[in-house]
Amino acid sequence: MNKFQEISYNFAFSMMGKVTYSIFLAFCLFTVKMGCAQQESQDFIVPEDSMQNLDDIVSQKSTAIIEYAKNFLGVPYVWGGMSPSGFDCSGFINYVFKGFGFNLTRTSYGLAELGKTVRLSELQPGDLMFFKGRNMSVNRVGHVALVVDTTDGVIQFIHAARTGIRIDTFNNSSYYVPRYIKSKRMDYIGY
């Protein structure tokens, strides 16, 4: 087992209990809300601490995904690459998320169709950002990156650049700002 397989294995099993709990909690909330309980239908209010627990689970999962992604800093860019010997942008995102049980579509264009659209001002660590590719005249998603930090409104993301896996800053970037298309938030509870 190489270093990256061991990390993936350890992350997957350390998160299993949290994922199982989150799925169970989401199912219970959904079942009660939809009136599957034996009593007559009544207004149902989700306790605030339960919603906080869900927020904490999402935050923990996105933090774990980001920390796992950082293990690959410096891995070279390889067009079509989907392994620690070399990644392209969507191959990197797929590999990282697969370590947490996500089975995502392969292309950046396909990934851009998943999740919930969020504004730049609403970005959180764990969100995905989508950009035009190298050819600015093509108005289509051609690149994807994972947001790692948004402290003080400064957006940093990890991605497979031509120079390899690295972290870049979005704000005031003469390369990424004009190529930005949209951002998406993944459903971390649903997986």
Q: Locations of the language-model features?
A:
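Aromatic- and glycine-rich peptidoglycan recognition patches
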Residues: N2, G35-I57, V141-Y191
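Intrinsically disordered, low-complexity
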Residues: N2-E6, A12-S22, L29-V75, M186-Y191
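A short catalytic or substrate-binding loop motif that flags glycine-/basic-rich loops and adjacent residues
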Residues: T20, V138-R140
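Catalytic cysteine-centered active-site loop
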Residues: D56, V75-P125, M136
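Short polar/acidic secondary-structure junctions
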Residues: R134-M136, T150
